[in-house]
Amino acid sequence: MAVISMKQLLEAGVHFGHQTRRWNPKMKKYIFTERNGIYIIDLQKTVRKVDEAYNFLKQVSEDGGQVLFVGTKKQAQESVKSEAERAGQFYINQRWLGGLLTNYKTISKRIKRISEIEKMEEDGLFEVLPKKEVVELKKEYDRLIKFLGGIRDMKSMPQALFVVDPRKERNAIAEARKLNIPIVGIVDTNCDPDEIDYVIPANDDAIRAVKLLTAKMADAILEGQQGVSNEEVAAEQNIDLDEKEKSEETEATEE
């Protein structure tokens, strides 16, 4: 059974593509028809592609991998943040800083600065420093949280990227491709699907459409995590049972 229904996709307006004059011919296979100068996406293909992306991210999660959610356009910012947090993943929803993946060592120094400023405040330094300096530190902190808060706990490269609008996030995609990090993307009719490993043909401009699909990808990750935890529990239970059996055997021998 599909993880998403045609009804859900229709209600969220996932089928509305861009104007026919603003299209990428490579998306032709995902287009159903044209209506009033707008391309209509083939939702049967979207259903199948959502399944593929879902299963991939579920597997990444089962294997203990992490996913970086990227969506800096206004329609995606809130969904990307809330769904990444819900799934315990990382996100960038303001601006992609150049080298975020390819020069992570430098970026990680800036992330470290977040903790440094927090410690300064905890240690009471804000109370003894000049007021002007404290104001500047708070501004710096707010700026760092705004742009890097979503990856402050990211200690290594993500195992996958989930991207809303590849055209908008072309820098993120270029860096991920350079590092061979698989990409799942919501791809509208004006985008190049060849840059994306797991294409989800869909409207990337409607908030409801973006939220629905982003939530589904978060669900996949959560399901994968559940699989991991279930296996761990089962393994622990087997160990406990083995120990119990050994203990019972020892007691029987002693008797």
Curated annotation (Swiss-Prot):
InterPro entries: Ribosomal_uS2, Ribosomal_uS2_bac/mit/plastid, Ribosomal_uS2_CS, Ribosomal_uS2_flav_dom_sf. GO terms for biological process: translation. The lineage of its organism: Bacteria, Bacillati, Bacillota, Bacilli, Bacillales. Coiled coil: none annotated. The keyword Ribosomal protein applies. Residues 226-255 are annotated as: Disordered. This is Small ribosomal subunit protein uS2. The keyword Kinase does not apply. GO terms for molecular function: structural constituent of ribosome. Belongs to the universal ribosomal protein uS2 family. GO terms for cellular component: cytosolic small ribosomal subunit. PROSITE patterns: RIBOSOMAL_S2_1 (PS00962), RIBOSOMAL_S2_2 (PS00963). Keywords: Ribonucleoprotein, Ribosomal protein. It comes from the Bacteria.
